[in-house]
Amino acid sequence: MWRGTLKIIFINRRKVGIIVILLGLMITLVGISEQFDDKLKTTILVENNINLLDDYTGLDGKISYKLPEGWTTREKKFPGGEIIYHNDFQSSDAVIHGFVEVWNSKEDLKIFLENSKKISQGQNIIKNYKMDSIIINGKKTYLVHYLINVTNNNWYKAYEYFIADNGQFYRISFFTRDVNFKEAYGAIFESIIDTFNVN
């Protein structure tokens, strides 16, 4: 004959109700914050006279991205096969410049960046170097930002984004003189990076 014990579980309906309401509020807040973030980026673009974005593609359509209308671009070719795509860009007011690159590299991206930092610090004066790991369009991305002294106390602020992808990595770099840098530029750069896709 079975002689088990019977356990009775009491559920406090009030606590369960509060937990359900809190979970619902948290989900709602996450959704609202994502919409707010998108609208904030759009507002920052408009406030900086960036109303439209032009489409760009590279490597026969393998990559696509957008840059603000009126920015000038120029593709360059490099020998050696390491850099297989390079497109320089400059803002219409010549304050922001940079480039989009695709590299062939089997080396781990983080190790590549650490080695690049050592080499660059040996050749240049660099301050406030910081590397963050973020997610852009579902891909792990390294954001490297720093100040670099180009000549005679002429400092430039750099924002560089690196995305690894199967034996290649993508580099999107933005540079502006430190005296011209505005806090809104970080959001502008991120809005441009959000348009970058590997097809």
Residue locations for each model-derived region?
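N-terminal targeting sequences that direct proteins away from the cytosol to non-cytosolic compartments
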Residues: 1-89, 154, 175-199
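Conserved polar/disulfide-associated segments of primarily extracytoplasmic proteins
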Residues: 2, 7-11, 77-165, 169-171
